[in-house]
Structure formats: structure tokens, C-alpha cells
């Protein structure tokens, strides 16, 4: 009987030990998979958009706090770089700001730029390549071509760039101030710090990037979607007449389709034309924009950087165009001046138009 009890005791402890080892191994694997080679444990927005994080973290209020609220304990401490902690400690010692307020500023800038950047809503993103990235190859391709079909596989013409250039990745930035008296008052009275200036700077860089994407920068030799040579140009009809907007978009999509582009198509218009689309279409009971959205399933957007009433229809896809991003927008500390503190919202990007024939402007 004693031997039976001993054997049962051994079996129980063997099973318990096995599961304990399995749990330790699993925890280490989870930690390494979540944070391996990542020095941005507390700054997930540097690489991911809100939509991406929402898809993984459903019904999780992570946005109101740092990411390590959920991904804490074993992994974060090992991967969160000492340099980053030391950098914040230096900033904190100079401006007397706590980490919660610093993260609040960073989150506000990220969410504001994500809300206001129109080009990034339909353009493929190439990157982020890193803060130090200063240039990127720019290949130009011809019209889409059919694949070959035969018995021996000898007649296929490979897709290749017609030419290659080097595109410079430019810094886009706007500075703002936080005043020493405001910071001290916020800390002493335990009131929220006013970050209106940071949000204003975020809106400013968003408009500048969209201006580069749509209008280009002629002084730097950067074409925009509305100015690229080789694009398709069609006449814009009077959209104040109900139905004309829809018909124009149909003709633009027809034009791109006839040249071999299958979509998805996206439409960007000026605010005035966007407002015209929000009227009930004749005897249908539907808004005109509803029919447009069924036609251009890549999205319908308005942009405030359009210099005139114009409509832009493009065939999206990285083969046709993309946005090369060096670094996403974030806040950097400039330094003290006159006892106040200067910050900079900064990022870097450049538009790469690889096939201008995939663009159709109605003007």
C-alpha cells in the first residue's frame, strides 16, 4: 500500500513539473515573439497605425495608456532600451514633465496626423525605412501587359522598370512651444497639460505632406498626383448639376480600365465637389456619392490642399505609386529658450509615382 501511495505521488509531481516547465517555456516564447529586436516597446505607434492595433486589440483601451500596460512583466524590461529611458530622463529633468504627459503629447500627434493625412488613406506605404533614410530608388513602369500562355514557356516578356532614378526623402516638420509657467502650473495644480500647440503642429505637417502628395514640390523636382506628366487629363463638367459628378467618375474609370488598370480605384476631390456629391440622385432616394462609392471601391476622399476644383481618380497599388516613409511623425524636444521649451513634430516621406498613366485628373 505504501508503495502504491509513493507511485501516485511521483506521477502527480511528474505531471506538475512538466506543466510548470511548459509554462515557463511558453512565457519566454511569447515574450520574445512580441518584443524581439524591438526598441519601441512603449511607442507602438511609431510602426503601427491605430487601425492595425485595433484589429489585434479589440475592445482593449490600450490607446489611453502605453502599450506595456498589456505587454508588461517579463519581456518589456529586457527589450526597452536603456538609451530610450535615459533620453526621456534627460528631457524630464530639463522641462519637469512626467512620462504620462509626454506619452499624451506623442499620442495626440499620432492620432491627429492619422486623422488628417488624406494621401496615406489610399496610398501603399513603403517603410518606415528609418530616421536616417535620405533617399530611395524610384522606378518607372509602363502600362500593364498580359501574361503569356503557350506550351513551352518561351514567349513571356518580363516586367521591368523603364528607368530608375533616386528620390530624396525630405523632412517635413513644424515647431511648437510649451511655456514653462504652463508646465509648472499643470504639475502643481494637477491639471491636464494643454497640448493645443502640439495638435496644431500635427495638422500643419499633415497638410504639408498632402500638399507634396497632390500638388508636388516644383522647386525640389517632386511631381504630385495632380501635376505628374503622362497622366490622363479629362474635362470636368458642372457638378452643380445632379448626376454630372457620377458620370465624370464613370468616364475616368472607363479611361483607366481601357488602359489596362483594373483597380481598386480611389477618388479625391476638392471640398466643394465633395459637397456636391451629397445630394439625392434623381428619383432614386440615394445620395449621389453612394453610387460613386460602389464604382470606386478604393474610397472617396476630400482634400483641403487642392488649389482649385478638380477631381482625381487613380488606380491604387504599389506597382503604380506609393509613399516612401523614412519615419512616421513624432515629437522631438528641440531645447530650452528664454526659460520656455521648444518641440518639433517631424517625419520624412516622398511620393513615388511609378506609372503616371494610372492617374486621371478631371479639371
From Swiss-Prot:
Positions with a binding annotation for heme 1: 44, 47-48
Main location: other
Cofactors demanded by this protein: heme
Classification via InterPro entries: ENCAP, Encapsulin_nc, Multihaem_cyt_sf
Chain spans, region Diheme c-type cytochrome: 37-74
Alphabetized UniProt keyword annotations: Encapsulin nanocompartment, Heme, Iron, Metal-binding, Signal
Region Linker: start-end pairs: 75-94
Signal peptide: 1-36
Region (Encapsulin domain): 95-363
Residues engaged in binding heme 2: 67, 70-71
Gene3D superfamilies: 3.30.2400.30, hypothetical protein PF0899 domain
Keyword Metal-binding: yes
CC cofactor note: Binds 2 heme groups per molecule.
Record GO cellular component, one term: encapsulin nanocompartment
Coiled coil: none
Assembly and oligomerization: The encapsulin nanocompartment is probably formed by 180 monomers, with the N-terminus (diheme domain) inside. There are 36 pores where the pentamers meet as well as 3-fold axis channels and dimer channels.
Record-stated family: Belongs to the encapsulin family. Family 1 subfamily.
Additional facts recorded: In the signal peptide was removed prior to generating the constructs for expression in E.coli.
Entry protein name: Diheme-cytochrome-encapsulin shell fusion protein
Source species of the chain: Kuenenia stuttgartiensis
Species lineage: Bacteria, Pseudomonadati, Planctomycetota, Candidatus Brocadiia, Candidatus Brocadiales
Gene name tied to this protein: enc
